[in-house]
Amino acid sequence: VLGKFHEISIETADIAASVAFYERLGFSHCGTTDTWPHPYGVMTDGRLYVGLHQFKFPSPTVTYVHPGVAHHSHAIEKHGIEMAWKRVGEDAFNEVGFLDPSGQPVRVQEAPTHFASERERSESSLCGDFAEFSIPAAEFEPMREFWEPLGFVALGETDAPYLRMSMTSDHIDLAVHRPRTLDQPMLVFAAPDMGERIERLRSLDVAMSSDLPRGLDPRHGALLRAPEGTALLLISAVD
């Protein structure tokens, strides 16, 4: 319904600092088009694409690509979704956007703004394998009802490693967590050797946040914060 997952679009006030942070974690650069007039760069671990925009917008945004988005937006609206914005026209880069029940922004644009990476999906970063983009929401059921018609399959709630509900799809997996776990979206990474990875990151002077969700073992879990404020949760396993 939404098209092909493109990137997690993130606002940054200092794109150079953000790029340097993801480089230190082992992410690679992607080539970009000249669509955006503002400074823009894309970092990837082979699975996840992080679009860094030195521009003010609702951030982070889950961004998809679907050709003919001006017309396709009507198909999205048939699911009862009200568009929060529409920028369409012959002289515009067409895009539409809406919010899920938690307020998470989602954008669908007419064409890619970066190229595919040559990096293999198996070439994980120092953070481990990207697992899911997790969204804070007080109630899980409205999120399930919203996202399932858009191509996601919601799994049952689980309390390991914290209370969450996973929603899988062909392109990117989402999840929902309680705001008391962390009151912002998280990029979640998992690896069975996460303890060793965390020690490696510490040796590279990557700072660990003290806001690690309650119940997680700091020997095998860590919370990183990018310069622009993005939360990256590192854990041994998501299930």
Report residues per predicted region.
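N-terminal beta-strand motif that seeds the catalytic metal site of vicinal oxygen chelate
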Residues: 1-16, 60-62, 109-145, 150, ...
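Vicinal oxygen chelate
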Residues: 4-13, 42, 54-129, 135, 157-158, 164-168, ...
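A short linear hydrophobic-aromatic micro-motif
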Residues: 29-31, 50-51, 82-86, 174-175, ...
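Short loop/beta submotifs within extracellular cysteine-rich repeat domains
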Residues: 30, 50-52, 72, 154-156, ...
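A short beta-turn/loop motif at secondary-structure boundaries
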Residues: 34-35, 56, 88-91, 179-181, ...
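Short, flexible, solvent-exposed loop/turn segments with mixed acidic/basic and small polar residues
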Residues: 51-54, 120-124, 175-179
